[in-house]
Design a protein with these regions (language model features):
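Short, acidic loop-to-helix structural element flanking the phosphoryl-transfer center
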Residues: 43-60, 105-112, 165-169, 221-233, ...
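Short active-site oxyanion
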Residues: 59-63, 82-84, 181, 240-241, ...
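Conserved acidic, metal-coordinating active-site core of Asp-based
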Residues: 119, 130-245
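Short hydrophobic/aromatic-enriched beta-strand-loop microsegments
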Residues: 83-89, 149, 207-208, 261-265, ...
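Non-catalytic pre-domain segments flanking phosphatase-related domains
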Residues: 1-32, 57, 316-320
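Active-site metal-binding loops of divalent metal-dependent hydrolases
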Residues: 36, 68, 91, 246-248
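Active-site phosphate-binding/coordination module
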Residues: 46-152
Length: 320
């Protein structure tokens, strides 16, 4: 049985308990989103790295499935011992974790890129283009972020991981047959949703997001689930053997199609509703908690920071 509907989408409590009857012995792979899921604001924690490496030693494959391009991956993630595959750009590429070699590619169709080029140059929104494993942004946007910051883009992250170019649309035309993903950023939700709906009506592409201020345009067959199916095929597994973790709409395909899905405590409502289980937040190392309690069957998989926070909260409640 895949899931117990009574536990599907249940809100995470201070110590979330899984009440279903899923057979966790069938899990042979863990698929992990990065931002808002595996990473905290300080990156990959020691405890998370140790837990993932322990899972690998136990014979469970660990696969990263992120919206980032390969060049934007933290070194700590690539250095997880035993990690074989990394899915990037929402499924556009699968790379060898040790060498960075691209093993699989499902980029946007050139016709889809042409349709995007008919629209975006007429709009004022910041655009990022993912191609060749790197992320590019217009130089004027890059310099403005460096000088003034932004209320709706992570200036520090963009400045660290993006390459500025003079003409972002010329780059898009030049690489129209190798575009992994196109990110568009918005200050206003009304504009974001209007552009989402506009692109969603067009053929040859998909639209998703990983933050409340962006949309991510990808290939019509590109998704984290499709890339995971490819990885499974290489390992002699199937998607029902996979436990997937995520927090945002670009994780939805793999959460729906994998054997067991885990939403983070900080996930969007639609992701929580789609999941079999809701763990604690990424800042509380919710990936660690879920793996240790569900897969390793430890009685208390709560990371020390989260446990201390809860004891403090209980003490404060007792004083009221």
């Amino acid at each position: 049985m895949k899931r117990d509907d009574k536990t599907r989408g249940a809100a995470a409590s201070s110590a979330p308990v899984y009440g279903g009857d899923f057979d966790f012995d069938t899990i042979r792979m863990i698929a992990l989103d990065l931002d808002g899921t595996t990473l905290t604001r300080n990156g990959l924690t020691r405890r998370t790295k140790e837990t993932l490496e322990e899972a690998i030693r136990r014979g469970i494959h660990v696969v990263i499935a992120t919206g980032r391009v390969y060049a934007s991956l933290p070194e700590a993630v690539k250095n997880i011992q035993g990690l074989q595959y990394i899915i990037t750009s929402n499924g556009a590429h699968i790379s060898d974790a040790a060498t960075g070699e691209i093993l699989y590619s499902d980029c946007m169709e050139p016709e889809a890129v042409d349709l995007v080029l008919e629209i975006l140059p007429q709009e004022p929104y910041p655009v990022e283009v993912f191609t060749g494993g790197k992320a590019y942004i217009a130089r004027n946007i890059y310099e403005d972020l460096a000088q003034n910051g932004s209320d709706f883009m992570s200036a520090k992250y963009v400045l660290r991981t993006r390459t500025p170019v003079d003409d972002i649309y010329a780059l898009m035309r030049e690489h129209r047959d190798a575009i992994e993903n196109i990110n568009v950023h918005f200050a206003a939700q009304e504009a974001r949703m209007a552009m989402w709906e506009r692109f969603a009506k067009l053929p040859h592409m998909t639209v998703t997001s990983s933050t409340h201020h962006n949309i991510e345009i990808g290939g019509v067959t590109t998704s984290k689930a499709a890339a995971l199916a490819e990885v499974c095929g290489r390992l002699g597994l199937e998607l029902p053997h996979v436990m997937a973790f995520g927090d945002s709409p670009n994780d939805l395909t793999m959460l729906r199609e994998c054997g067991f899905s885990v939403a983070m405590g900080n996930a969007t409502p639609d992701i929580k509703a789609a999941a079999d289980y809701v763990t604690i937040t990424n800042e509380e190392e919710g990936v660690v908690y879920a793996i240790r309690t569900l897969l390793f069957r430890e009685k208390d998989g709560v990371p020390p920071r989260a446990s201390l926070r809860r004891r403090l909260a209980a003490w404060m409640r007792g004083r009221r």
